[in-house]
Amino acid sequence: MKAWLICLLVICAAVIAEPVESRNYIEYGAINKCAGPNPPPGCNPPGAEQKNPTPVNEYSRGCSKIHRCRRD
């Protein structure tokens, strides 16, 4: 009796564990935050031209004429 029960459980497990069709890759839309329903700030709407980023701080060596720093 126990052997039949074990055989039945093995057969049921084999039927249930049948391979499921799935993709082996993630689509770009799933990882693109700007394509979602609530895009974060800084994302351009779809179809809009890409804006060139404006530099936040201009380069400065940290020494100006008013501070009388040594010049090279």
From Swiss-Prot:
A Pfam family matched in the record: RALF
GO biological process: one example: calcium-mediated signaling
InterPro entries reported for this sequence: RALF (IPR008801)
Location(s) in or outside the cell: Secreted
Intrachain disulfide bonds: 34-43, 63-69
Similarity section: Belongs to the plant rapid alkalinization factor (RALF) family.
Function, as annotated: Cell signaling peptide that may regulate plant stress, growth, and development. Mediates a rapid alkalinization of extracellular space by mediating a transient increase in the cytoplasmic Ca(2+) concentration leading to a calcium-dependent signaling events through a cell surface receptor and a concomitant activation of some intracellular mitogen-activated protein kinases.
Full protein name: Protein RALF-like 11
Species this chain originates from: Arabidopsis thaliana
Upper taxonomic lineage: Eukaryota, Viridiplantae, Streptophyta, Embryophyta, Tracheophyta
Encoding gene per record: RALFL11
